[in-house]
């Protein structure tokens, strides 16, 4: 009955020292590191250069990217996981989170622009809102693209103007990414 007064939240041995992690926990940790390594291998070369990691790990990841044979790649991924046991994975995970966050933000931005394009096609008054948001926008060009996109849709032609309208909106958004986000806050403060 040694364990009767044992606190399950804080495992200690008889001398009051914390117990080492169980074999199952160590295996879960190793699999997590190996999964992190898989994410590294999936990155592009440019993204990989931005990840803070020791040169030996970077070499192992590059080698794993080159491998095509299943068993060889599996062994290399285990080696990547082994190398990761000796480093702090937090900076690597933080950089991966940044990459994932950026891609999610870009997807959200594209969806927002697609909705705006649909609004333009549904209502010409939206063009005025675009010109107010982005003063550098060419009202006449947007109006022509809208008219051509509607005509293409009506005649079942390829959506050339439809795509061009999206490109123009995307270029406007990239050229002035900060002002549209700031303008509503300025209006609210007045």
Curated annotation (Swiss-Prot):
The keyword Transmembrane helix does not apply. Disulfide bonds: none annotated. Its main location: cytoplasm. Signal peptide: none annotated. It is found in: Cytoplasm. Gene3D superfamilies: PSPTO4464-like domains. Keywords: Cytoplasm, Ribosome biogenesis, RNA-binding, rRNA-binding. Residues 1-31 are annotated as: Disordered. GO terms for molecular function: ribosome binding; rRNA binding. The keyword Chaperone does not apply. GO terms for biological process: assembly of large subunit precursor of preribosome. GO terms for cellular component: cytosol. Transmembrane segments: none annotated. PANTHER family: UPF0307 PROTEIN YJGA. Member of a network of 50S ribosomal subunit biogenesis factors which assembles along the 30S-50S interface, preventing incorrect 23S rRNA structures from forming. Promotes peptidyl transferase center (PTC) maturation. NCBIfam families: PRK05255.1-1 (NF003593). Belongs to the DarP family. This is Dual-action ribosomal maturation protein DarP. It comes from Aromatoleum aromaticum (strain DSM 19018 / LMG 30748 / EbN1) (Azoarcus sp. (strain EbN1)). The lineage of its organism: Bacteria, Pseudomonadati, Pseudomonadota, Betaproteobacteria, Rhodocyclales.
